[in-house]
């Protein structure tokens, strides 16, 4: 009787040894074989059923909001969203702490003040000028956190939201002469 022919499976590491001479299995490298059987499988690049046109596959492109079938309605217009983004309720107040900088600025009796969050920073300047009794020809310089001078059209609520201290107060430093920058 002759020995049966040697048969190979698709994986050369899983071949059946012949009956005549035992051969050791080929050495396995830890870098080529996965360490565990729970390794993620490699996705095949087989074309989908809907790719019948014969063209090469195109990369996945993001869908626009109007082309998506998952959305039940389109989001609000960006301008409408931005118009309401900076609005504050009329009854919301912001606590402002006034600090004099330098020797030329007089101290206030009440350094804490509540101002409506919807008002512009020019209302803070007008309040301070009125409280200090500053004339029309004199200047007052205001700074947030002793760092920068905001524009007069900034909303006080936005400044408070971005620059309030750990006590929830907006620190406004003031001087009769330029103090910072």
Curated annotation (Swiss-Prot):
Membrane topology: Peripheral membrane protein
Gene3D superfamilies: Phosphatidylinositol 3-kinase Catalytic Subunit, Chain A, domain 1
Region of interest: Disordered: 1-64
Chain residue numbers at which the record places covalent cross-link Glycyl lysine isopeptide (Gly-Lys) (interchain with K-162 in ATG5): 181
Molecular-function annotations in GO: Atg8-family ligase activity
Superkingdom: Eukaryota
Keywords from the named record: Autophagy, Isopeptide bond, Membrane, Protein transport, Transport, Ubl conjugation pathway
Keyword Coiled coil: no
Keyword Transport among record annotations: yes
UniProt-listed Pfam families: APG12 (PF04110)
Predominant localisation class: membrane
One GO cellular component, as annotated: Atg12-Atg5-Atg16 complex
Localization per Swiss-Prot or TrEMBL: Preautophagosomal structure membrane
Function: Ubiquitin-like protein involved in cytoplasm to vacuole transport (Cvt), autophagy vesicles formation, mitophagy, and nucleophagy. Conjugation with ATG5 through a ubiquitin-like conjugating system involving also ATG7 as an E1-like activating enzyme and ATG10 as an E2-like conjugating enzyme, is essential for its function. The ATG12-ATG5 conjugate functions as an E3-like enzyme which is required for lipidation of ATG8 and ATG8 association to the vesicle membranes.
Family: Belongs to the ATG12 family.
Protein name as catalogued: Ubiquitin-like protein ATG12
Lineage, highest ranks first: Eukaryota, Fungi, Dikarya, Ascomycota, Pezizomycotina
């Amino acid at each position: 009787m002759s020995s049966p022919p040697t048969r190979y499976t698709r994986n050369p590491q899983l071949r059946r040894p012949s009956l005549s001479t035992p051969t050791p299995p080929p050495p396995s490298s830890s870098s080529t074989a996965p360490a565990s059987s729970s390794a993620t499988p490699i996705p095949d690049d087989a074309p989908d059923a809907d790719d019948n046109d014969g063209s090469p596959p195109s990369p996945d492109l993001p869908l626009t909001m109007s082309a998506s079938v998952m959305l039940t309605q389109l989001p609000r217009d960006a301008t409408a969203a931005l118009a309401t983004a900076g609005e504050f309720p009329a009854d919301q107040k912001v606590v402002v702490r006034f600090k004099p900088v330098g020797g030329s600025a007089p101290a206030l009796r009440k350094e804490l003040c509540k101002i409506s969050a919807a008002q512009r920073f020019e209302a803070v300047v007008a309040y301070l000028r009125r409280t200090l009794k500053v004339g029309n020809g004199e200047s007052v310089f205001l700074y947030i956190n002793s760092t920068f001078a905001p524009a007069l059209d900034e909303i006080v609520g936005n400044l408070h939201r971005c620059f309030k201290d750990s006590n929830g107060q907006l620190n406004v430093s003031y001087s009769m002469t330029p103090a910072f920058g």
